Amino acid sequence: MAVFALVPAAGMGKRMGASINKQYLILAGRPILAHTLSVFEGASFVDGIFVITPEDEIPFCRDHVVERYGFTKVRGIVAGGAERQHSVLNGLRAMEGTVADDDVILIHDGVRPFVSTDVLARATAVAREDDGALVAVPAKDTVKTVEDGIITGTPPRETLWLAQTPQAFRYAVIRAAHEIADAERFLGTDDAMLVERLGRSVRIVVGDYRNIKITTPEDMVLAEAFLKELAA
């Protein structure tokens, strides 16, 4: 049972307000995407990586990230779609012929560079035994449900978790979930949701609050602080 990473990096990053897409912004001398790929490259149990990027950025990703930083595990760079879900489906289809049905696929945002090898390993172990694994952290704040500006409920905080990535599944499970969602024109907010709607069980893997998704200038400030902390 091999392990492959599928790394969506096709976002446009409008909230960042930068002239280039967020995955290529420089963090401590390297693109954010390069930091993320380094974690998978260095994980001995990860056998290969597929990166998803906008079609017109494939040469840039290949030349300035994959080849420049020597990511030898990258098996393919795949063109993204209109939405993240479409991009992931493109990636899963591109994996056909390379991965087996029971291989574990770690789907991880290209702009989450602080994921740890330990988290990857624990998510992989769960995905081998269950229908899927979702890395998440407990909610710290009280969450309200609201309609038309009026609070309609307060879910018990102990039941609320903030979803992160990676989200890990066996290839046959996640491929089927995405194909069915695509055929039914259902658009979910994450990969686990597509598996859940088929009646399958996705287990929580406790993550790390530092595993942030870098989408705003404020996130870049946090990321730089995390790097300084790690270097200390």
UniProtKB/Swiss-Prot annotation:
EC category: transferase
Signal peptide (residue range): none
Pathway assigned in UniProt: Isoprenoid biosynthesis; isopentenyl diphosphate biosynthesis via DXP pathway; isopentenyl diphosphate from 1-deoxy-D-xylulose 5-phosphate: step 2/6
Domain of life: Bacteria
GO biological process, any: isopentenyl diphosphate biosynthetic process, methylerythritol 4-phosphate pathway
GO MF, one example: 2-C-methyl-D-erythritol 4-phosphate cytidylyltransferase activity
Site (Transition state stabilizer) location in chain: R15, K22
Site (Positions MEP for the nucleophilic attack): R157, K213
Keywords for the protein's UniProt record, in alphabetical order: Isoprene biosynthesis, Nucleotidyltransferase, Transferase
Catalytic reaction(s) noted: 2-C-methyl-D-erythritol 4-phosphate + CTP + H(+) = 4-CDP-2-C-methyl-D-erythritol + diphosphate
E.C. code: 2.7.7.60
Stated family: Belongs to the IspD/TarI cytidylyltransferase family. IspD subfamily.
Protein's job: Catalyzes the formation of 4-diphosphocytidyl-2-C-methyl-D-erythritol from CTP and 2-C-methyl-D-erythritol 4-phosphate (MEP).
UniProt protein name: 2-C-methyl-D-erythritol 4-phosphate cytidylyltransferase
